[in-house]
């Protein structure tokens, strides 16, 4: 049921605009249970959790390369043009950050310089559902590609039909990322941190999410997987 408010008192604004959230202890217990299930039952846990939480049954979490390539045919041409403009702008910005680092001799025979090296394996969490954030994939995927990251793995929640939004797959195609997995929520973060039969274990996880995803990233950090932020 939708409620409509008309000229609410200023004292009530904080309560009205407060996002729903679980008590911290309860949230930790829920996420810890998810981690225990993924650790114990591997991909089977992911299937059970996806059915329970996302309302769809997934047998093969990895999106096929042909499905990724076909996605552009389902997207409005004007949206594709806009995405390519955004891609070019983001690419030019991050590419400008690659500069040769000067070596400084701080004392005879002692030279110092700054060196940047790519992370080998990263996981990108891309929110999906009713509002797929393909912009997040552009802003995370482009710098990862420029940096020379060898293995980029995308996890994103499927819809009720067990599918990923075409626009996310289209962005993955222009980024030339083939490892896209139909899995979201706290369980996807656990899968990236622990590794499963299907989803590779990564060195660092990037990307925003809800309170369950954020708490799961905290667990990932305690498991030895680097994260971008909480």
Predicted regions and their residues:
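Alpha-helix termination/capping residues and helix-transition junctions
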Residues: 116, 146, 174, 196-199
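Flexible, glycine/proline-enriched loop segments at strand-loop-helix junctions
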Residues: 35, 127-131, 153-159, 176-183, ...
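Alpha-helical scaffold segments in soluble metabolic enzymes
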Residues: 33, 37, 48, 82-85, ...
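Active-site-proximal helix-loop elements at catalytic-domain edges
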Residues: 1-14, 166-180
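Conserved small-residue-rich beta-alpha loop and adjacent elements
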Residues: 104-170
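N-terminal Rossmann-like NAD(P)+-binding subdomain of aldehyde/semialdehyde dehydrogenases
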Residues: 1-120
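Conserved NAD(P)+-binding/catalytic subdomain of aldehyde/semialdehyde dehydrogenases
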Residues: 176-230
């Amino acid at each position: 049921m939708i409620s409509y408010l008309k000229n609410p008192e200023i004292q009530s604004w904080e309560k009205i605009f407060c996002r729903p959230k679980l008590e911290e202890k309860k949230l930790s217990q829920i996420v810890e249970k998810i981690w225990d299930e993924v650790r114990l039952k591997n991909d089977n846990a992911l299937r059970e959790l996806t059915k329970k939480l996302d309302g769809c049954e997934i047998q093969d979490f990895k999106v096929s390369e042909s499905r990724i390539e076909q996605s552009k045919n389902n997207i409005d041409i004007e949206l594709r043009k806009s995405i390519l403009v955004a891609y070019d702008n983001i690419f030019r910005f991050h590419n400008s950050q690659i500069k040769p680092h000067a070596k400084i001799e701080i004392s005879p025979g002692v030279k110092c310089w700054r060196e940047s090296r790519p992370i080998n394996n990263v996981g990108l969490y891309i929110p999906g559902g009713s509002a797929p954030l393909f912009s997040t994939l552009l802003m995370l995927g482009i710098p990862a590609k420029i940096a020379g990251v060898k293995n980029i793995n995308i996890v994103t929640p499927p819809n009720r039909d067990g599918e990923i939004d075409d626009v996310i797959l289209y962005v993955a195609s222009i980024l030339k990322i083939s490892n896209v997995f139909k899995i979201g929520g706290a369980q996807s973060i656990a899968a990236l941190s622990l590794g499963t039969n299907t989803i590779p274990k990564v060195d660092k996880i990037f990307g925003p999410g809800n309170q369950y995803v954020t708490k799961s990233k905290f667990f990932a950090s305690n498991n030895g997987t680097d994260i971008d932020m909480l």
